[in-house]
UniProtKB/Swiss-Prot annotation:
Gene3D superfamilies for this protein: Putative methyltransferase TM0872, insert domain (1.10.150.170), Vaccinia Virus protein VP39 (3.40.50.150)
GO MF term list: rRNA (cytosine-N4-)-methyltransferase activity
Record region (Disordered): 272-318
Alphabetized UniProt keyword annotations: Cytoplasm, Methyltransferase, rRNA processing, S-adenosyl-L-methionine, Transferase
Primary location group: cytoplasm
Regions of compositional bias (Basic residues) in chain numbering: 289-301
InterPro entries the UniProt entry points to: RsmH (IPR002903), SAM-dep_MeTrfase_MraW_recog (IPR023397), SAM-dependent_MTases_sf (IPR029063)
Cellular compartments per GO CC: cytoplasm
Species in which this protein is naturally found: Psychrobacter arcticus (strain DSM 17307 / VKM B-2377 / 273-4)
Highest rank taxon of the organism: Bacteria
Reactions that this protein is recorded to catalyse: cytidine(1402) in 16S rRNA + S-adenosyl-L-methionine = N(4)-methylcytidine(1402) in 16S rRNA + S-adenosyl-L-homocysteine + H(+)
Compartments where found: Cytoplasm
Protein name: Ribosomal RNA small subunit methyltransferase H
Length: 334
């Protein structure tokens, strides 16, 4: 890890809770002087679908047996360099430089069809925000890029050069829930160039008619453009759907989200696949079997202590569920 990459090491959110969830336990062992009691020594294959700087992965590795495997995914080239360094010192780690939306195909290329646990920490990481050159921050100057993977795809600046006002406004509204999307979109499209995040943030600030105290007026617009350019919500949907065939029965799914657009998707997915539904055709004499792919999901938020130590954790939610093999017939009232 380079000195620059070390400077961006950050605290993983809901660290203990997420790792315990993906291992299917209520809590990790308390650390004692007896090292033999400090690890669950879990065997199997696990996936950290968003490696970042490896906070969750490192704690998970401490709980895995020597014969276990941890596969880590990330789109960010810097994150991949950190992951590869970890893999060079721990043979249990395998690295995939790609989106977790490629989960099934990437695992198949390794000869893996099912895993024991899936974990993801969605959205943008603190190191990405704090590195102004990436373009994610409206508080630090940099190129208007915002790509998670800077080695491929179109930057936000390139997209803004060609997008029309209406499409931009729709993106700001749909992915940022920005109520003043049309006014802001018109102001953005009147800019002569898109080379500076601070310039872009200032234009949005001036165009925004109603500032919320304690919240920068460019917050939702930057979020919207980032989510759109990286297809974040589409990737989340693909990842969740792939979790059904990829997880073994008894395997664990644990996903951390930071805003309502992500959290709503996870919530609805788990609700849909954790309880039976009657068929849409009411004329059928009896409902067909409906697969129940997950147990009743649970949700956990950060503690007051974690929020105090890491204010960026305040909006985080961890949703978790266990993969089941239950196929059942919905009860019918006579």
């Amino acid at each position: 890890m380079t000195s620059d990459e070390l400077s961006f090491v950050h605290d993983a959110v809901l660290l203990q809770e997420a790792v315990a969830a993906v291992l299917g336990v209520k809590a990790l062992p308390k650390q004692t002087d007896d090292e033999s009691q400090n690890s669950l020594q879990a065997s199997g294959i696990y996936v950290d679908a968003t490696f970042g700087r490896g906070g969750h992965s490192r704690l998970l590795l401490s709980q895995l047996a020597d014969n276990a495997t941890l596969i880590v995914f990330d789109k960010d080239p810097t994150a991949i360099r950190v992951a590869q360094e970890l893999a060079s010192t721990d043979s249990r780690v395998q690295v995939v430089h790609d989106s977790f939306a490629t989960l099934t195909d990437s695992l198949a290329a390794m000869g893996i069809t099912q895993v024991d646990g899936l974990m993801a920490d969605l959205g943008i990481s603190s190191p990405q925000i704090d590195d102004g050159s990436r373009g994610f921050s409206f508080m630090r100057d940099g190129a208007v890029d915002m790509r998670m993977d800077t080695s491929r795809g179109q930057s936000v600046a390139e997209w803004l050069e060609t997008v029309d006002d209406d499409t931009l406004a729709n993106v700001l509204y749909d992915f940022g829930e920005e109520r003043h999307s049309r006014r802001i979109a018109r102001a953005i499209k009147q800019m002569d160039r898109y080379k500076s995040t601070l310039e872009l943030a200032e234009v949005i600030k001036v165009a925004h008619p109603n500032w919320q105290r304690g919240k920068h007026p460019a917050t939702q617009s930057f979020q919207a453009m980032r989510i759109f350019i990286n297809n974040e919500l589409g990737d989340v949907d693909n990842f969740l759907e792939q979790s059904i065939p990829i997880l073994k029965v008894g395997g664990q799914l644990a996903v951390i989200s930071f805003h309502s657009l992500e959290d709503r998707r996870i919530k609805q997915f788990l609700q849909r696949h954790s309880k039976g539904q009657y068929p849409e055709d009411e004329n059928l004499p009896m409902p067909p079997k409906r697969p129940r792919y997950f147990s009743k999901p649970k949700r956990v938020g950060p503690s007051k202590a974690e929020i105090s130590n890491n204010p960026r954790s305040r909006s985080a939610w961890l949703r978790m569920a266990t993969r089941t093999d239950t196929d059942y017939l919905a009860d019918i009232e006579p």
